[in-house]
Amino acid sequence: MERLRNSTPRKILWEEFLIPMEISQYRLSKDLEIPQTRISEIIKGNRRISADTAVRLSAYFGNSAKFWLVLQFDYDIENEINKLSEDIERIETRGENKKVVSNKNLNKS
């Protein structure tokens, strides 16, 4: 099964928001009123973006909490598909939509 290219929420936060806006992790954590370790762990890839963090990021950057949660959700799903790809291929699909579950088809939504 082909591996998916997976854009990480941490990479988007770092490269698309913090670097261009010249915002440090420290400044972001202070402005969001959260521990600095939370942002640091997200940037390192050791922590997921929670609903709480998503709401705070959306208020700060002027986008929606769903933007951040969907980034995290898509990342998590793609990781699981890649991790379970061999198992998924062995599962026989029941019903009319044979082999709907694949990297190619799941990535379309």
Predicted segments, located by residue:
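Short, charged recognition helix plus adjacent turn
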Residues: L69-S109
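Short alpha-helical DNA-recognition segment
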Residues: E22-E41
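The DNA-recognition helices of helix-turn-helix-type DNA-binding domains
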Residues: P35, N46, F61, Q72-Y75
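A short, Lys/Arg-rich alpha-helix, primarily the initiator
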Residues: M1-I23, N107-S109
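The alpha-helix within a helix-turn-helix
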Residues: L18, S29, S58
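Short, basic-rich loop-to-helix N-cap that marks the start of a DNA-contacting helix
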Residues: N46-A59
